[in-house]
From Swiss-Prot:
It holds the Pfam family Clathrin_lg_ch. Belongs to the clathrin light chain family. Clathrin is the major protein of the polyhedral coat of coated pits and vesicles. It comes from Oryza sativa subsp. japonica (Rice). This is Clathrin light chain 2. Residues 84-146 are annotated as: Involved in binding clathrin heavy chain. Keywords: Coated pit, Coiled coil, Cytoplasmic vesicle, Membrane.
Amino acid sequence: MATAFDSPTASPAASPFDDDSFLRFDAAAPAPAPADAFPPSPEPYAFRPDAPSPFGMPEANGSLHDDPFAAPDNDNGPVLPPPNQMGADEGFLLREWRRQNAILLEEKEKKEKEMRNQIILDAKEFKKAFVEKRKLNVETSKDQNREREKLYLANQEKFHAGADKQYWKAISELIPHEIANIEKRGAKKDKDKEKKPGIVVIQGPKPGKPTDMSRMRQILLKLKHTPPPHMKPPPPPAAATGKDGAAGKDGAKVAAAASKDASANGSVPEMEKAAAAAAPAAAATEPIAAA
């Protein structure tokens, strides 16, 4: 049975393949130029003439545009700096932290300045109060020293007034009457703290060793036997030679009393002086008694 597929002319698809005008295009044949096309350029590829082209566009990096992002004419390097000089892109949290930190530092600096100014004011007030207190203490000390000096001079006058009469009593008055309290090392008890004597003697490096008083005894003995001139008693008055023997007896009694005082004081030269003064008085009484 015959079908449409059996006949070569039954369908348009069965027409010859070369009948299409598009398929019959020959690449070697020159292409027809349209009437409105530009003439071909005689310049080869990558050739730029000295004269500018009337149809060309100006360069982006030229002076015809005021582009702030354009590179300068004489710059041949990269537009961006090197990567090691470019900072890392900071995030929002880091920028916010830097802002808060700057605010905190500013507040802290402000507080420090206020505190410093307050300290300076307090120091000025303290110095002013210290100077005033110092002046008051100096004036008080001057008054106290004047009173103490007056008392000391009065005591010295009193001491020298009676020192020539009983100088051993004067020496005993020079020694303080307070009993020295020996303070031991270590912890103090409450009872010891309550007692506050006038003189406190702290034990030396050798506890239990008695104080050497030999030098003090030597000085006292030297003062006893050879007293200084201001502590020597005045010489007794000379016995008045009278016609009656009463004056002679009185002179002998005065000489005997002086010798007794001298012996009581313990001064050997004074005893000799008293004996020498009593001898003429006794010699003067003997002729009167014989007569």
